[in-house]
């Protein structure tokens, strides 16, 4: 019940010092530094407490990662954290870690180096309250602990080559100062012997010619005989012939655009998904050069893109380097037996029986040898992680290429053939919108659809009866409807029946039906032979229409079909009208002529003929129903013409009678 609450830094520190990490995770270390900087002194205290717990861990990796994290905090989090590092708890934990015999040598070296650097850093602050770290440093130095400096970073191949070139240049300059251009081959002579030498030269010139092969030994003998008595105590030293040592073959310069391996010269942390993170000195295997500034590579078991400006080219490994790496790898795998032996020995020790590690010095030796293998094991883990990532990338590319190959080889999939004349159904979202637009703009006028003019006036053209669905598809546009409505309003008939808009306009979800009159020069009278189209609710009913039929009637009638008397009676009964019995309908306009043409027999004016009456009824029906065209008004009963020969000749007779 006295246990303290879990610190928010425990999880962060455990994650940053995980024993399974192959190397320090600097990204996690920076996250911890940022959090400590934002939390101030309280955050520094909690972070150092969490690090102190990790120092007591028995895994050397955890201890090394904890020391590295503490050093990162000391370099980035200011005076608050330096004060916590100078606390009694932290310095005591470091003292126990360094003086413990079970602590591995790499951990001791790193702890001693950090104690020295932290003591110097705290001393520079000048705060007298932070003297515990300096005291610890003095105590450890009094115990003859060696505070090794941090190991220098290994020189790169470029730096080694440059250093060798500078050394070779200095050596050549020293040799050039000692070299006199071959003058040491001649024997030194004092200035007093100049005359003798000149006289001897004259004697040589006046002497007879001697072969050159004999003259050279003679000249040498004369020079030696003259120089020997003149110079006393001088022994010419033999000339040192400079023989340059064979230099190591300079590694060939590798073009960055052709190199298969590159080394990072700057650390890089990716900001986007798919970017490769690496530290300075990491070797990256180049996999793809798809872009000019960004390449794809493998490093630390991951594959991603990296900036080209952050790396430098590496030459291919020489056979000697490959052999050394193979031998080192074989040594690591051969040491696995040592690790297994250490594990079995540790299992045989039981503290309950009183066994102690101090009684088994061989365990300490095996443990230290196993810890020394840790760095090599991590290197091999990175190597095989990169190879695994490369193989996975290769496998993915192979699967993609195999799929494309099969697709190209088998061809595109066959499209199922549709029957002839098949048209896929298409939705008509504007149908209801057009209908509602028509009814809302002109609610009092029934919508009509103009019929095209017939091309052959004397030929019977069958008008197909369309189904309601087809009528719905042939709904006129709003522009045509508005024009037809405007024309209907201009009709001069005073006896137009004003209908109720609610009764005249059909429901918005039902199609509109309209049977227009004939637009040809020959008027047609409907007949009952064709079935009457069903009228929607609320729409006015119209006379039944059918193609005209020729029947034998009384003389003087132009063969018009008499139609169905029962259908006409039903129509008049529905509208509350009476069948016409006179030649003039009451609803007929006064402007129409009252007399029949003279070409008609007088007996027809006073008598009632079925065809004549039906024509008058048809005219009355047209007077009650507004039509969208001025020419659609029916002709007078006396001037109705049929489609027969008699009707045509009768019209021609009237024209001849009334011609001016």
UniProtKB/Swiss-Prot annotation:
Residue ranges constituting the VHS domain according to the UniProt record: 16-148
GO BP annotation list: protein transport to vacuole involved in ubiquitin-dependent protein catabolic process via the multivesicular body sorting pathway
Subcellular location: Endosome membrane
Location of the UIM domain: 164-183
Bias-annotated ranges (Basic and acidic residues): 158-182
Polar residues composition bias: residue spans: 517-533
Family annotation (InterPro entries): ENTH_VHS, SH3-like_dom_sf, SH3_domain, STAM, UIM_dom, VHS_dom
Domain SH3, first and last residues per copy: 257-316
Region Disordered: start-end pairs: 146-254, 437-660
Record note on quaternary structure: Component of the ESCRT-0 complex composed of HSE1 and VPS27.
This protein's name: Class E vacuolar protein-sorting machinery protein HSE1
Organism: Cryptococcus neoformans var. neoformans serotype D (strain JEC21 / ATCC MYA-565) (Filobasidiella neoformans)
């Amino acid at each position: 019940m006295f246990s303290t609450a879990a610190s928010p830094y425990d999880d962060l520190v455990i994650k940053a010092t995980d024993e399974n990490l192959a190397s320090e995770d600097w990204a996690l270390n920076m996250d911890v530094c940022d959090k400590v900087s934002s939390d101030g002194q309280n955050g520094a205290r909690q972070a150092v407490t969490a690090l102190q717990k990790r120092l007591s861990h028995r895994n050397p990796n955890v201890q090394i990662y904890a020391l590295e994290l503490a050093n990162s905090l000391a370099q980035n989090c200011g005076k608050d954290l330096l004060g916590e590092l100078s606390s009694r708890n932290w310095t005591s934990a470091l003292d126990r870690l360094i003086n413990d015999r079970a602590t591995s040598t790499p951990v001791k070296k790193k702890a001693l180096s950090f104690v020295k650097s932290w003591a110097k850093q705290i001393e520079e602050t000048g705060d007298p309250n932070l003297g515990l770290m300096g005291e610890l440093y003095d105590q450890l130095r009094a115990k003859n602990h060696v505070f090794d400096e941090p190991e220098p970073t290994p020189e790169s191949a470029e730096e080694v080559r440059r250093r060798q070139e500078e050394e070779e240049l200095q050596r050549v300059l020293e040799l050039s100062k000692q070299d006199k251009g071959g003058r040491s081959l001649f024997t030194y002579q004092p200035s007093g012997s100049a005359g003798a030498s000149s006289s001897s030269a004259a004697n040589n010139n006046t002497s007879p010619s001697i072969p050159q092969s004999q003259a050279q030994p003679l000249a040498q003998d004369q020079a030696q005989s003259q120089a020997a008595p003149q110079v006393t105590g001088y022994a010419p030293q033999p000339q040192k012939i400079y023989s340059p040592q064979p230099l190591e073959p300079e590694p060939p310069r590798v073009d960055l655009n052709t190199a298969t391996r590159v080394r990072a010269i700057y650390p890089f942390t990716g900001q986007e998904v798919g970017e490769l993170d690496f530290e300075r000195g990491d070797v990256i295997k180049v996999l793809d050069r798809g872009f000019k500034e960004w390449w794809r590579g493998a490093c630390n078991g991951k594959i991603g893109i990296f900036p080209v400006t952050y790396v430098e080219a590496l030459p291919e490994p020489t056979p000697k380097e490959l052999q050394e790496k193979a031998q080192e790898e074989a040594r690591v795998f051969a040491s696995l037996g040592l690790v297994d032996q250490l594990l079995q020995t540790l299992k045989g020790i039981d503290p309950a029986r009183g066994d102690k590690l101090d009684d088994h010095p061989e365990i300490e030796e095996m443990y230290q040898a196993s810890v020394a293998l840790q760095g090599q094991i991590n290197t091999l883990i990175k190597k095989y992680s990169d190879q695994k990532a490369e193989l996975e990338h290769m496998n993915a590319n192979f699967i993609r290429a195999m799929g494309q190959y099969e697709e190209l080889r088998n061809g595109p999939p066959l499209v199922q053939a549709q029957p002839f004349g098949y048209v896929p159904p298409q939705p008509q979202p504007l149908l209801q919108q057009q209908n509602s637009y028509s009814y809302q703009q002109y609610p009092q006028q029934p919508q009509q659809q103009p019929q095209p003019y017939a091309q052959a006036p004397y030929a019977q053209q069958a008008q197909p009866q369309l189904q309601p669905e087809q009528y719905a598809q042939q709904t006129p546009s709003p522009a045509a409807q508005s024009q037809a409505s405007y024309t209907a309003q201009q009709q001069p008939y005073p006896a137009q029946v004003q209908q109720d808009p609610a009764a005249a306009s059909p429901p918005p979800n039902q199609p509109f039906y309209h049977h227009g009159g004939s637009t040809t020069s020959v008027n047609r009278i409907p007949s009952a032979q064709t079935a009457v189209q069903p009228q929607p609710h609320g729409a006015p009913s119209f006379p039944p229409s059918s193609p005209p039929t020729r029947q034998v009637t009384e003389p003087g009638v132009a063969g018009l079909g008499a139609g169905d008397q029962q259908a006409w009676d039903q129509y008049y009964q529905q509208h509350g009208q009476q069948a016409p019995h006179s030649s003039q309908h009451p609803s007929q306009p006064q402007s129409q002529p009252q007399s029949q043409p003279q070409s008609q027999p007088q007996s027809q004016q006073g008598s009632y003929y079925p065809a004549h009456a039906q024509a008058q009824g048809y005219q009355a029906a047209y007077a009650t129903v507004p039509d969208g065209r001025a020419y659609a008004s029916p002709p007078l009963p006396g001037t109705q013409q049929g489609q027969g020969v008699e009707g045509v000749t009768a019209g021609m007779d009237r024209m001849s009678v009334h011609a001016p």
